[in-house]
């Protein structure tokens, strides 16, 4: 090989070495809870096994993930303690719409009649929190067992219902069970139309997943309002209060 050819070969090798190497495509890691996602049933089965501590940790992790604009103090105000959450892992049935009445009955107070409404208008004993209006409508239908004349299940979500209509409904109607989305429930409480005076339990529809395998804690637009709703001072102080206790349950 001539000297010129040898020099040209070395130049080409140096040029090849200087070319940026193509990055290897990494496969997207599988979600830790993929095994618990039952798409056919529309359930994330992990929630059925979580006790108060696991749920508190899960909520804190999601709040930190979506609350990036908040200070550490503001985030801390949104955290819920394990002691605030009632353990419902003893419920053995699938957490489907059909089994919601059984769940409510299992964790109701002794001799409590869920189809009866407190005497004060707009003051339910049970709040059920859903991710979206369509799901909330399904939950309302699932609770028909507890609906009777003088105690309708309240529909407190934005889809097809204006805030003013719901304010008017609550002002003139007694209701035992109310189903709503986080932000609309906050708006109605702050408006003064939805009273929490007689509230005995909050049930978060957590196991349900949508077609994209997301539950109420998996989306910023639902998780952050949920965190703010559950961490309200008038709720937080009652999670561990014996006299005016509120059960916080995750279905």
Curated annotation (Swiss-Prot):
InterPro entries: Cms1, P-loop_NTPase. Its main location: nucleus. Gene3D superfamilies: P-loop containing nucleotide triphosphate hydrolases. Keywords: Nucleus. May play a role in the regulation of DNA replication and cell cycle control. Belongs to the CMS1 family. PANTHER family: PROTEIN CMSS1. This is Protein CMS1. The lineage of its organism: Eukaryota, Fungi, Dikarya, Ascomycota, Pezizomycotina.
């Amino acid at each position: 090989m001539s000297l010129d050819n040898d020099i040209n070969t070395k130049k080409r090798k140096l040029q090849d070495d200087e070319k940026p190497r193509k990055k290897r495509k990494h496969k997207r890691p599988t979600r830790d809870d993929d095994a618990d996602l039952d798409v056919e049933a529309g359930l994330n089965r992990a929630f059925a096994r979580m006790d108060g501590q696991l749920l508190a940790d899960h909520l804190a992790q999601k709040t930190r993930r979506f609350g990036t604009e908040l200070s550490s103090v503001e985030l801390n105000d949104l955290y819920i303690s394990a002691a605030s959450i009632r353990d419902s892992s003893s419920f053995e049935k699938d957490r489907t719409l059909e089994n919601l009445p059984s769940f409510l009955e299992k964790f109701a107070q002794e001799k409590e009649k869920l189809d009866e409404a407190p005497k004060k208008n707009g003051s339910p004993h049970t709040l059920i929190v859903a991710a979206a209006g369509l799901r909330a409508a399904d939950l309302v239908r699932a609770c028909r067992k507890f609906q009777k004349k003088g105690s309708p299940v309240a529909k407190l979500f934005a889809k097809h219902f204006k805030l003013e209509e719901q304010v008017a409904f609550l002002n003139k109607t007694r209701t035992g069970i109310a189903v709503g989305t986080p932000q609309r429930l906050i708006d109605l409480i702050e408006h003064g139309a939805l009273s929490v005076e007689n509230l005995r339990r909050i049930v978060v529809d957590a196991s349900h997943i949508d077609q994209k395998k997301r539950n109420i804690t998996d989306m910023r637009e639902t998780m952050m309002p949920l965190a703010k709703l559950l961490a309200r001072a008038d709720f937080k102080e009652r999670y561990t209060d014996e006299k005016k206790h509120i059960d916080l349950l995750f279905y």
